[in-house]
Amino acid sequence: MVYGYQDASLRRICRAVGLTTGALYKRYEGKDSLFAALLEPTLIALDQYGQEQKRRDYAFLEEGHLSDMWAHRLEDLQSLMRILYEHKDIMQLLLFKSQGSSQADFRMRLPHLAADETYRYLELAYKEGKINHLVKHEFLRSCMTAYYTAVFEPLAQDWPQEQALEFCHSIMDLFDWGGLLGF
């Protein structure tokens, strides 16, 4: 973790855990597959969080209660922040020390995926007449990138979890998603 992906040495890792490099290569194809295995539980936790949010938001759309999405957004953001802090070391590695790995673009890829998913949702809501304005996709992407930059900032600054949870209030004040998205 100290060295980050690019400066990590498989020999040094093997020495630290008492393995031979041959034993490591029997299980992992190389440094990137070892890195992927290290990240997997964290990525699964993030995906599960995202899937839960998606299910709930689509239920609001189906019921015609889009504005109810905003009722628990602070709690949702704090839940996400808790997940990030449950996996703090791995998240810091992934976000800030993954250069050279297949996940080096994660910090940019996540907001783009979130924007794409949100845009599909908005298109459906617009087609169904549940919203009367559709934000431009590129604007949404830029806003999502700014949002996730703010969400990841406590990890970048290595703040304690309580301070990160408190910062969620500021993030919510800064990002008026209901105003931007029109509901």
Give names to the regions the model predicted:
Residues 17-28:
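Short hydrophobic/aromatic patch on the recognition helix
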Residues 63, 67-89, 141, 145, ...:
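Amphipathic alpha-helical segments that line or abut small-molecule/effector binding pockets
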Residues 2, 12, 16, 33-60, ...:
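Alpha-helical structural segments
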Residues 76-86, 101-127, 138-145:
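Amphipathic alpha-helical packing segments from all-alpha helical-bundle domains
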Residues 122-174, 183:
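Hydrophobic/aromatic-rich alpha-helical bundle segments in the mid-to-C-terminal region
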Residues 92-94:
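Short, hydrophobic secondary-structure boundary micro-motifs
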Residues 1-8, 28:
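Short helix/strand-capping hinge loops at secondary-structure junctions
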